[in-house]
Amino acid sequence: MIKINKVDVNDLEVLSKIDIDNFEDAWTKEMFKSELEHPNAEYYGLFNDEEMIGFCGGWLVSDEYQINKIVIDKPHQNKKLGQIFFTYVMQVLKTKGVKKALVEVRVSNMPAITVYEKSGFATIDIRKNYYKNNGENAYVMVRDFSNEQF
């Protein structure tokens, strides 16, 4: 059964493994630990029964949420889980009073861009040479919740 729960530093090992398995520029365990211990960190895990199969997280500062990581593990991709998960996280953020959510995404990552656009995000800027491992540009995308109804 699919479920979504908050995650924290106790989930460090599995978060790190999913990140390494899915990204060339994955974070180290130390980076994850620092991120998860930050007072503004809000991370959510997507679980299939007891197995974490994805996560989304970032910083909640005032009424803005900066998405730092979102991933669905490769064996579970292309099953609409990313869209369902991301939509749920956005609803949770709205209930917490978030007015704006921001994310940077590789310009080549069309699956992620599609999820973001279907979730109400729009591209507002391009960060040149944003990704250190290959110099790829990133789109800056934003969703403004301030005029949305619940």
Regions found by a protein language model. Name each.
Residues 79, 83, 127-130, 137-139, ...:
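Acyl-donor (CoA/ACP) binding surface of acyl/acetyltransferases
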Residues 34, 108, 131:
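Positions that flank functional sites
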